[in-house]
Amino acid sequence: MARTVRDAAWVLGAIAGRDGRDNYTLASPHPISENTHRVTHERIIPDVTRSSQLKLRSAKVLIVGAGGLGCPAAQYLAGAGVGTLGLVDGDTVESSNLHRQVLHRSKNVGKLKVDSAIESLRDLNPHPTYIAHRAHLAPQDAADIFKNYDLILDCTDNPATRYLISDTAVLLGKPLVSASALRTEGQLMVLNNPPRSVGDKTGGPCYRCVFPRPPPANSIMSCADGGILGPVVGTMGVLQALEAIKVITATDEEVKPPSLHIFSAYSSPLFRTIKLRSRRPNCAVCSGEASVTLETVKSGSTDYVFFCGSVGPEKLLLPEERISPREYRTKYPVTASSEAIGTVTKEPTIIDVREKVQFDICSLENSINIPISSILSSATKTAQNNEVANGSNPLPPWLPADIASSDSIDPIYVVCRLGNDSQIAVKRLKELGLDRGGERVVADIRGGLRAWREQVDPEWPEY
């Protein structure tokens, strides 16, 4: 091992095709020998041979998602000298991304993430070929994109896309490195490795083999809603790059049994490993009984949104069940006299369904906090809810008595950070009978507190 930070940098530089002074020597007829000569005072890494480096330089790797996972993964693969790197993402850089999406810079806020990432990668290593796919991955395009690459990295954060990526990788015979991260935990898997043909039991399992059923739609939490510790997602992205290098440079004899690696920042030990089974005999995509094909994926017959129970937020509620922040403030204005004393006119109940840690950062005046997690965990069937509203059963523990009272018909408006969880909460509250059969307004503030900042209060904290 290197004895100093400087020596360690020399070792990594040799792997990446650079010398200790950050001079690239890729054009040399014997680049591996020259770089190895520069670090002869250190131990030579036995797993990184000349053959390994040549494999890396001829490899074509596709990274789906240029966010918290994709940025560190791309950074280390570019540094390792991977020949071609493709990036797929349709999002633009936001200031709230910068703490964890390490390729992006403040100057690139508003720029497409793939363009921002490639700009940084070229500064790191100008020699690889970088390919930008400036759109979210769609079923009709996935196969046409994937076919040009040797290895796929899933750096996304939603189940529907994960299943799409895995299915397409299996059907095209591409190994897949998949990772996820939320809050202080992460998961990592190498799937479809070795990438045998559909129906071949000796191939590595796919995402459907590990998770044949998606999680309940109302249990899914994004980084924007649940939060993420930057080093956690960075750790998982770096490990994706490491696994990608191992897949690229391995021989058939070196393929390891499939495993699920679980990282928890506040546990000891930090990592746990669970051995995975081989391909499921009835898997919908990689078994002999497969029903998912490239044709069903491309045509839309395999409906990933329906399979995952994901409904676009705009489809959860009717227009009359929603109100924009501007419309809300117009309907319930702050009067001149009340502004002078720092209060507002009598307003309906505002329920903020963010988790308490976010509510404590900032909150609308007179709003109350009922976290969405409490609402979902305590929700009951509609028939039982009607009984609750009539007082024949105990109230859910999270529901204040004055709001649930059968005498109360004051309007209820629900708000969250981005306008997604609030819609789910409105549906749950109506299932509980709190709309009194339509006599009481129970509505969502469209776009959440982000829209509130844009339409009502430009000074509202953004986090």
Swiss-Prot record:
Pathway: tRNA modification; 5-methoxycarbonylmethyl-2-thiouridine-tRNA biosynthesis; Cofactor biosynthesis; molybdopterin biosynthesis
UniProt GO BP: cell budding; cellular response to oxidative stress; invasive growth in response to glucose limitation; Mo-molybdopterin cofactor biosynthetic process; protein urmylation; regulation of pseudohyphal growth; tRNA wobble position uridine thiolation
SMART domains recorded: RHOD
Record flagged with keyword Transport: no
Catalytic reactions on record: [molybdopterin-synthase sulfur-carrier protein]-C-terminal Gly-Gly + ATP + H(+) = [molybdopterin-synthase sulfur-carrier protein]-C-terminal Gly-Gly-AMP + diphosphate; [molybdopterin-synthase sulfur-carrier protein]-C-terminal Gly-Gly-AMP + S-sulfanyl-L-cysteinyl-[cysteine desulfurase] + AH2 = [molybdopterin-synthase sulfur-carrier protein]-C-terminal-Gly-aminoethanethioate + L-cysteinyl-[cysteine desulfurase] + A + AMP + 2 H(+)
Binding, Zn(2+): C206, C209, C283, C286
One GO CC term on file: cytosol
EC code(s) of this entry: 2.7.7.80, 2.8.1.11
Taxonomic superkingdom: Eukaryota
Active site: C223, C416
Ligand binding (ATP): G68, D89, S96, N97, L98, H99, R100, K113, D157, N158
Chain ranges of the Rhodanese domain: 344-461
Function recorded in the entry: Plays a central role in 2-thiolation of mcm(5)S(2)U at tRNA wobble positions of cytosolic tRNA(Lys), tRNA(Glu) and tRNA(Gln). Also essential during biosynthesis of the molybdenum cofactor. Acts by mediating the C-terminal thiocarboxylation of sulfur carriers urm1 and mocs2a. Its N-terminus first activates urm1 and mocs2a as acyl-adenylates (-COAMP), then the persulfide sulfur on the catalytic cysteine is transferred to urm1 and mocs2a to form thiocarboxylation (-COSH) of their C-terminus.
Protein name as annotated: Adenylyltransferase and sulfurtransferase uba4
